[in-house]
Curated annotation (Swiss-Prot):
The chain crosses the membrane at residues 21-41, 45-65, 142-162, 170-190, 222-242, 262-282, 296-316, 326-346, 347-367, 377-397. GO terms for biological process: polysaccharide transport. To S.marcescens SfuB. Keywords: Cell inner membrane, Cell membrane, Membrane, Plasmid, Polysaccharide transport, Sugar transport, Transmembrane, Transmembrane helix, Transport, Virulence. Probably involved in polymerization and/or export of exopolysaccharide EPS I which functions as a virulence factor. May play a role in export of EPS I or its intermediates across the membranes. Disulfide bonds: none annotated. This is EPS I polysaccharide export inner membrane protein EpsF. The gene is epsF. It comes from Ralstonia nicotianae (strain ATCC BAA-1114 / GMI1000) (Ralstonia solanacearum). InterPro entries: EpsG-like. One of its GO terms (cellular component) is plasma membrane. It is found in: Cell inner membrane. It is a multi-pass membrane protein.
Amino acid sequence: MKYSAPIRLNTLGAIASQHGVLVVIGMLLVVPMAFPLLPIIATYCAAIFVILLPLGRLQHVLATASSVAFAWLLTLRNPSKGLVEAGLGDDALHYMNAFYEFQQAYCCGPLDVLKTGIRSAGGGEPIFWFLSYSVAKLFDTPLLVWAVLIFISLMLAWIAIYRCSERFAYVVFVSYLSTITLYALQGSAIRQAVAAGLVMIALDLLIRRKLVSAAGVGLIAAGTHSSAAVVLLACAVVVLFLSRDYGMLARRSSGLGRVGRLIVLLALAAAGAVFGSAEFVMSKIQARLSESQTGSAWELQLAVEAVLACLFAWLLRIKLPREEKMAFLLFVVVCFSTSLFAPAVGARLFRYTYCFYIVYLCAFFFARQGESLGQKKTLASLLLLASFGWAIFIVSARYQGLFVSGGVIDHFLAGPFF
């Protein structure tokens, strides 16, 4: 005998009434634990829609929402439970102290801002500390200042990515959100996080042959974190001494090319005047040499990633200008050379290799005009799948503190439901 529709509905209602309490309890247990993961899940789901549909400028909304969500999630790590467990370093507390001093000071001159930054975090890069001071005057807690700086760094990266690859820009942006660089930089290396976003924009301008603009953005990046000056110098050496195109431009245009070269040289001279003082350089070198860092895990990772990047570029015939390839190879050589006498410096420079990878990946999608849209969608799907797997590995291996030990999940378990 078949059940009629009313009987079936009554049966479902009875089941719901008998187990309603269990259902509610289950929701109260699941929602607080699942909600912190929803922004991450939504980010990857949105990337799938970008692959399937041409969303165009709607990607700006998605990138902004993802940046806000990740900035919020990354600031929920609780340093009091242990810096290692929270996926942070000692500098995170130093930055918090500096932000707190900025918020407590009623008036603070430029020199006082720099002195506070040097005393708290050991770095006197003016652009970062002036930016932090401005943000600190707008918000009440150091945690909000930290979140805003994370948001700024992510949006800078998004600007560079979208300029290179409009169609699949959000997919590439999600790949950046899946790297170890994201979690490392947004914690105890927030200065370098902002500088990395500026470096990506400078690399994009270099690909477009806007050399003066690239030099200007590179100088701003160096004023945010001095390590970015190494990337700037590597690109400048390639452009000024190894570039055939720029040399031909200078010869063909009697006035314009020479003026452009002169502006670039003056910009480098200004960088040397600001960051090249003996006191500044020696303080940086002594600080880095005093750090005890053993092991060669990052060196092995750099070698493997560099070889895979070159192999990937050769197999897929990535069309990149000669200067970009030489700048990347020169920067890798500098990283390895620096690691011989100052491993801590090399480890910091290593983080910028992801700037090359991401911008070049965008240029790959942008430059391959002969490929069909289906092939590009396939490559974007593989990139998204690999990024998701890599993110799971990184979080489970090194950044569990983002979700446990006072992190996101514990934060919500202590919320309104419990």
